[in-house]
A protein has these predicted regions:
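TPR/TPR-like (Sel1-like) alpha-helical repeat modules
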Residues: 72, 85-95, 99-129
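Helix-start (N-cap) detector for alpha-helical repeat units in TPR-like alpha-solenoids
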Residues: 27-28, 43, 61-62, 95-96, ...
Length: 157
């Protein structure tokens, strides 16, 4: 919504809540409300909303990837890794999941596998190198963004 573009989170949330009052399973509204809650720093609520969006529309890969990122933000590394690996098996060309798994694996010390996933992600979508794009447009949580940027700093250094 325009409110999201203006970072008016309460107005944006009100728009999505209005939609959800009429259709509690509207996957797009659930996902977008998850983005709003994440932008407000409420990653627990964000995770719940992304998961509900993915359940409402099972092929909604971005909702599942966002749920994995929110789980990672809350230190559920094993849950995040499992979900990202499932996404990559199902959608091998899904750059978001590959980029996220790169940062997560690097954080866990698996640098070789991280580099392998990053090679695929970078070839699919070079925007994942851009911190501001990750935070402001794609709206990754701070922890995954920091880890991916740290990984890339070593790769570039």
């Amino acid at each position: 919504t325009a409110e999201e573009a203006l970072k008016d989170w309460s107005a944006a949330a009100a728009d999505y809540l209005w939609i959800l009052e009429r259709d509690p399973n509207d996957a797009a509204a659930l996902y977008n409300l998850g983005n709003v809650r994440g932008s407000e720093g409420d990653w627990n609520q964000s995770l719940e909303l992304y998961s509900r969006a993915a359940d409402a529309q099972p092929g909604f890969a971005m909702a599942r990837s966002s749920a994995a990122l929110a789980a990672w933000q809350q230190d559920d590394l094993s849950g995040a890794e499992a979900e990202l690996r499932k996404l990559i098996r199902r959608y091998p060309l899904f750059a978001d999941a590959r980029a996220a798994l790169s940062g997560l694996l690097w954080q866990q010390g698996a640098s070789g596998e991280a580099e392998s996933h990053w090679a695929a992600a970078a070839g699919l979508d070079p925007r994942y190198r851009q911190r501001d794009w990750l935070l402001e447009v794609r709206r990754w949580p701070p922890q995954p963004t920091r880890q991916l940027m740290a990984f890339l700093a070593l790769e570039d250094g």
